[in-house]
Amino acid sequence: MSHYKENKLFQFLLSQFGEDESLRLMKLYRVGTANHWQGSTVFWQTDIQGKVRTSKIMLYNPANGRRIKEPHNHITWVHSLIHKDGFTLKQCFFGEHLLAKDSTKSVAIVESEKSALIASSYLPQYLWIASGGKNGCFREENLSVLKGRNVVLFPDLGATDDWAARISTMQRMGITVKLFDYLEKNATPEQRKNGFDIADFILEVKRPQTILQGMIAKNPSLNLLIKELGLVLIEEPVHPVSTVKRRGFKL
């Protein structure tokens, strides 16, 4: 779980969150780097008991965080590359190992591993895990780790009805479930065409740190100045009763 500087997904996260937060997210979710494709990302599936089940390898565009799908879809599995004799695939949620660290926090489920990382930073009140696809990890043996938990489903656009159909099974298993369908009800045609998910919507709402990282990318010397002077990004109301924010730095 190193060589992050060569990792294309890490490079994208760096542009959004800065180095400290990007490193925290990669280590928290045990994300690695592969040389199958230069700078590709390894998403290890580690279960609630800390056992590695398998891992998915994908290649991302560092400029926009999208998966590389041309001239072919850059996605594969570690178990398919090593050809281990007698191996039986038994997947689990990406990020499932985090369930053992906090038994009280509400759990949010998304499709994409990348989206789990991004949403975890912006909405830390949830414990974010990923199913790995529209139909991934919804068998009862996968869902059993969520028994007794409060769960919110965040389907990609176009998958809301499919995920809504899973709710009755989950409730029968003792899982308290809510469906976040705001995106499905309010998305634009362009967003639907691009298959937006919660992380895509989150990234459209630029927070101060993201804006700062964009400034640093254009002028790297700004980062040196910030570190040299010990500047800290602030965001505070201009007036106690105003919702307008003033952004800047403090020493």
How should each PLM-predicted stretch be described?
Residues 2, 108, 159:
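Charged, low-complexity surface patches
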Residues 36, 42-147:
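Phosphate-handling DNA/RNA-contact segment within nucleic-acid enzymes
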Residues 104-105, 116-251:
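TOPRIM fold recognition
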Residues 1-53, 99-101, 214-251:
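TOPRIM metal-binding catalytic domain and adjacent DNA-binding surface shared by DnaG-type primases
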Residues 10, 22, 70, 80, ...:
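Short linear sequence motifs
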Residues 14-15, 85-97, 186-196:
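Short, exposed beta-strand "edge-strand" segments with a Pro/Gly-rich flavor and a Y/T-containing core
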Residues 34, 63-68, 185-192:
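Low-complexity, polar-biased intrinsically disordered regions enriched in Pro/Ser/Thr/Gly
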